[in-house]
Amino acid sequence: MTTTRHSSTDSVNIPGWGWQPFLEDAVQALQPLNLEPYPVANDFLYKQDQTGSKAKPITVTTATWACKTDKFRQVRAACVYGGTAASVLNFVINPSARFDLPFFGGDLVTLPSGHLLALDLQPADKSDEAHTQQVWEKLIPIFERWRSKLPDGGPIPEEAQPFFSPGFLWTRLPLGDEGDQLINSVVRPAFNDYLSLYLELAEAAKPVGDDRRDHLLKGQRRYTDYRAEKDPARGMLTRFHGSDWTEKYIHTVLFDL
């Protein structure tokens, strides 16, 4: 199956892709805002290739949904589906540095080994109490509500810790009925709770002065530079679509600040 997407806000519909309901929830939650398409080159709006062996080829599809608003520099969803090889939704909201907001991050990954699922409101500067306190006071109760229902995903690397909040919800789930049930009954409502809080914080956010903007922008760049360098999807995307396409996608779409 092939499809054409002319704009980054055109709907994404990938047959068999398990994270479709999550993307639809997010797009629906954003509808009250004044959404404008975010500029994404045609080659990254929709890409299909073949992977696997000659005897058992696998069609892989990567699509990008993206928009911008007055307070969000970029909202983007990287959607990847390669049958049993991989199914991914990486949904990130990059706020404008004119507003004292964290990032929203949802990373939902299915691999042959299982599901790896992460949600967070990620700080631009974790050491800045003025930036984090109002967020964490509201985030931690939501985190506590859902983490008790999920197995812990394990430790995160020390070098990554500055980029995650104490409300980082991170789990690994098995393939099959047990994992699917937890995704539907726990992970999806948790995703929507995190996103609802983020949109509530954004609605209340007021513009900051130039010095504060510069401080936040510096922190945002630290985050995006780190993510671009360490993107765990690099190997998978390179295998699916080649190195040149992958590096351009990472640096000009996913982490383009």
From Swiss-Prot:
Alphabetized Gene3D superfamilies for the sequence = 3.40.1500.20
Question: Top-level EC class, please?
Answer: oxidoreductase
Catalyses which reaction(s): (3Z)-phycoerythrobilin + oxidized 2[4Fe-4S]-[ferredoxin] = 15,16-dihydrobiliverdin + reduced 2[4Fe-4S]-[ferredoxin] + 2 H(+)
Instruction: Name the EC number(s).
Output: 1.3.7.3
Per the record, the domain of life is: Bacteria
Does the record's keyword annotation contain Glycosyltransferase? no
Ordered alphabetically, the record's keywords are: Oxidoreductase
Please give the Gene Ontology molecular function terms for this protein. cobalt ion binding; phycoerythrobilin:ferredoxin oxidoreductase activity
What InterPro entries does the annotation carry? Ferredoxin-dep_bilin_Rdtase, Phycoerythrobilin_Fdx_Rdtase
Family named by the database record: Belongs to the HY2 family.
Relate the protein's function as given in its record: Catalyzes the two-electron reduction of the C2 and C3(1) diene system of 15,16-dihydrobiliverdin.
Under what name is this protein listed? Phycoerythrobilin:ferredoxin oxidoreductase
Protein species of origin: Synechococcus sp. (strain CC9902)
